[in-house]
Amino acid sequence: MGSELESAMETLINVFHAHSGQEGDKYKLSKKELKDLLQTELSGFLDVQKDADAVDKVMKELDENGDGEVDFKEYVVLVAALTVACNNFFWETS
């Protein structure tokens, strides 16, 4: 078994691929696939968002190349940004 960080990396990869490719390119998330991923894996994030257009806004910000889909690199940017925000929140409140 690998380290905690290796396990976390494997989980990031597995979660992405569990949701990608259901509507097309298996290496990208469509808007629907991204929404499903967020609802399944980051439901707390969506619960905090009171904005009904939150997924649209996340998609627009992540989709750096403007192809209407989120590739693995763009997905990792989302996870990294949320991780930084969580780190700041928990360390500032402790």
Swiss-Prot record:
Record PROSITE patterns: EF_HAND_1 (PS00018), EF_HAND_2 (PS50222), S100_CABP (PS00303)
Pfam families: EF-hand_1 (PF00036), S_100 (PF01023)
Sorted UniProt keywords: Calcium, Cytoplasm, Metal-binding, Mitochondrion, Repeat, S-nitrosylation, Sarcoplasmic reticulum
Modification note: Glutathionylated; glutathionylation increases affinity to calcium about 10-fold.
Domain EF-hand residue range list: 13-48, 50-85
Gene Ontology annotations for the cellular component aspect, listed alphabetically: mitochondrion; sarcoplasmic reticulum
Residues the entry annotates as binding Ca(2+) 2: D63, N65, D67, E69, E74
One Gene Ontology biological process: regulation of heart contraction
Leader sequence segment: none
A GO term for molecular function: calcium ion binding
Result of knocking out the encoding gene: Deficient mice show unaltered baseline cardiac function and heart rate, but display deficiencies in their contractile function in response to beta-adrenergic stimulation and enhanced transsarcolemmal Ca(2+) influx. It also significantly accelerates the development of contractile dysfunction after myocardial infarction, with a rapid onset of cardiac remodeling and a transition to heart failure combined with excessive mortality.
Residues bearing the modification S-nitrosocysteine: C86
Location within or outside the cell: Cytoplasm; Sarcoplasmic reticulum; Mitochondrion
Disulfide bond residue pairs: none
Expression sites (tissue/organ): Expressed in the cardiac and the skeletal muscles.
Additional facts recorded: Able to bind zinc in vitro; the binding sites are different from the calcium binding sites. The physiological relevance of zinc binding is unclear. Physiological concentrations of potassium antagonize the binding of both divalent cations, especially affecting the high-affinity calcium-binding sites.
SUBUNIT field: Dimer of either two alpha chains, or two beta chains, or one alpha and one beta chain. Also forms heterodimers with S100P. Interacts with AGER. Interacts with CAPZA1. Interacts with FKBP4. Interacts with RYR1 and RYR2. Interacts with CACYBP in a calcium-dependent manner. Interacts with PPP5C (via TPR repeats); the interaction is calcium-dependent and modulates PPP5C activity. Interacts with ATP2A2 and PLN in a Ca(2+)-dependent manner. Interacts with mitochondrial F1-ATPase subunits ATP5F1A and ATP5F1B; these interactions increase F1-ATPase activity.
Protein name per Swiss-Prot or TrEMBL: Protein S100-A1
Organism whose genome encodes this protein: Mus musculus
